């Protein structure tokens, strides 16, 4: 399994491949995206792509993880935030998804492709866990048990 690159040029190449994959999702759909198409769109050879990703699903997993991480970074982790801050966060979340290469298609892909659903679900579990930990630490709702708070956060 290829590791994440550390050098600037390698990081830029990996990002270029992810951007190309996102753009192709919007152009041709997840079924028709191939590693050869992504390599061509990114202006690299297929062996270069395979230096960074084992296969199509490793590439699409990384693409989904990149978007999930960026979205999660926008979520205010202070459970005491007022509604205006939360509403702005949601609008920023939507805008980030729109501006990301293939963003809306990445979200659809994470729901439609069984091999990729875990990317979205693990991201949600991680973020839910962080929100619950902060809420419990602040005693947002004294006396409420952890399982109940996790369910409410997950459904929100």
Model-derived segments and spans:
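N-terminal intrinsically disordered/low-complexity leader segments
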Residues: 1-12, 143-146
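Alpha-helical DNA-contacting segments of helix-turn-helix folds
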Residues: 60-67, 120-123
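Short secondary-structure transition hinges
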Residues: 99-129
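Hydrophobic alpha-helical segments that form the core
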Residues: 92, 96-97, 128-129, 143-156
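An amphipathic alpha-helix signature
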Residues: 18, 87, 91, 125-136
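Hydrophobic alpha-helical connector segments
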Residues: 62, 75-100
């Amino acid at each position: 399994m290829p590791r994440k690159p550390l050098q600037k040029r390698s990081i830029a190449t990996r990002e270029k491949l992810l951007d190309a994959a996102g753009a192709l999702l919007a152009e041709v759909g997840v079924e028709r995206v191939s590693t050869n198409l992504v390599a061509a769109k990114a202006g690299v050879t297929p062996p270069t792509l395979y230096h960074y990703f084992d296969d199509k699903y490793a590439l699409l997993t990384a693409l989904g993880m990149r978007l999930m991480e960026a979205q999660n970074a926008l979520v205010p982790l202070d459970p005491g935030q007022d509604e205006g801050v939360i509403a702005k966060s949601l609008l920023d979340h939507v805008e980030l998804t729109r501006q990301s290469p293939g963003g809306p298609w990445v979200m659809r892909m994470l729901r439609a492709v069984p091999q990729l659903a875990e990317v979205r679900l693990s991201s949600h579990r991680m973020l839910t866990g962080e929100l619950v930990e902060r809420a419990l630490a602040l005693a947002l709702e004294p006396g409420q048990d952890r399982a109940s708070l996790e369910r409410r956060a997950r459904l929100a």
